[in-house]
Amino acid sequence: MAHPFQTGLQDATSPIMEELLHFHDHTLMIVFLISSLVLYIISIMLTTKLTHTNTMDAQEVETVWTILPAIILIMIALPSLRILYMMDEINNPSLTVKTMGHQWYWSYEYTDYEDLSFDSYMTPTQELKPGELRLLEVDNRVVLPMEMTIRMLISSEDVLHSWAVPSLGLKTDAIPGRLNQTTLMAMRPGLYYGQCSEICGSNHSFMPIVLEMVPLSYFEKWSASML
């Protein structure tokens, strides 16, 4: 989860988020090198009055600064397309959970079970227990098995919402009349927090998401107790 004064991304919990972190570092290094080169050239231009007459109208230089940016863009585009393909790929999910956005709470339905559904509201500040997080805790957590492919079906009952959990690299729009889907897989147990990431009204900031990733045996006991 995020920490105060954090400047980097959250720790990766899913394979997709690990790929996104690698892509972020890859792109950031390219941007850093380009920025350093531009700043170096600007500093040289500002500190010298000499002019290289051979580069004022050189076809070779124009060819280089046309081809080189194209190569750099390809170096950025190819990893990006690979990750986009991975995020859209869905292979035989072990569990399907339907998520509906409301003003201003989430409802969840485990479609593989009968009558396993609940609403998830933010826990008011005055009801928080010691150690719980303000504006991030909910009354009903989404309990899911770890190390399994889970499909999330996401839609909305009223206005636009967005279901996002940064540690898992997830952000999917909840659109009325449309059913979007995404997959997740957590590699370790724990609590993972997210929030609605689409402005949806006055209480937009009070729609937290809490995923509790647990071993399969614990999930089976939990699901049996909920039925």
From Swiss-Prot:
It is found in: Mitochondrion inner membrane. GO terms for cellular component: mitochondrial inner membrane; respiratory chain complex IV. Cu cation A1 binds at residues 161, 196, 200, 207. Gene3D superfamilies: 1.10.287.90, Cupredoxins - blue copper proteins. Keywords: Copper, Electron transport, Magnesium, Membrane, Metal-binding, Mitochondrion, Mitochondrion inner membrane, Phosphoprotein, Respiratory chain, Translocase, Transmembrane, Transmembrane helix, Transport. One of its GO terms (molecular function) is cytochrome-c oxidase activity. Its main location: mitochondrion. Residues 46-59 are mitochondrial matrix. The chain crosses the membrane at residues 15-45, 60-87. Its cofactor is Cu cation. One of its GO terms (biological process) is ATP synthesis coupled electron transport. It comes from the Eukaryota. Belongs to the cytochrome c oxidase subunit 2 family. Residues 1-14, 88-227 are mitochondrial intermembrane. Binds a dinuclear copper A center per subunit. The modification Phosphotyrosine is found at residue 218. Component of the cytochrome c oxidase (complex IV, CIV), a multisubunit enzyme composed of 14 subunits. The complex is composed of a catalytic core of 3 subunits MT-CO1, MT-CO2 and MT-CO3, encoded in the mitochondrial DNA, and 11 supernumerary subunits COX4I, COX5A, COX5B, COX6A, COX6B, COX6C, COX7A, COX7B, COX7C, COX8 and NDUFA4, which are encoded in the nuclear genome. Mg(2+) binds at residue 198. Component of the cytochrome c oxidase, the last enzyme in the mitochondrial electron transport chain which drives oxidative phosphorylation. The respiratory chain contains 3 multisubunit complexes succinate dehydrogenase (complex II, CII), ubiquinol-cytochrome c oxidoreductase (cytochrome b-c1 complex, complex III, CIII) and cytochrome c oxidase (complex IV, CIV), that cooperate to transfer electrons derived from NADH and succinate to molecular oxygen, creating an electrochemical gradient over the inner membrane that drives transmembrane transport and the ATP synthase. It is a multi-pass membrane protein. It catalyses: 4 Fe(II)-[cytochrome c] + O2 + 8 H(+)(in) = 4 Fe(III)-[cytochrome c] + 2 H2O + 4 H(+)(out). InterPro entries: CcO_II, CcO_II-like_C, CcO_II_C, Copper_CuA, Cupredoxin, Cyt_c_oxidase_su2, Cyt_c_oxidase_su2_TM_dom, Cyt_c_oxidase_su2_TM_sf. Cu cation A2 binds at residues 196, 198, 200, 204. SUPFAM superfamilies: Cupredoxins, Cytochrome c oxidase subunit II-like, transmembrane region. This is Cytochrome c oxidase subunit 2. Its EC number is 7.1.1.9.
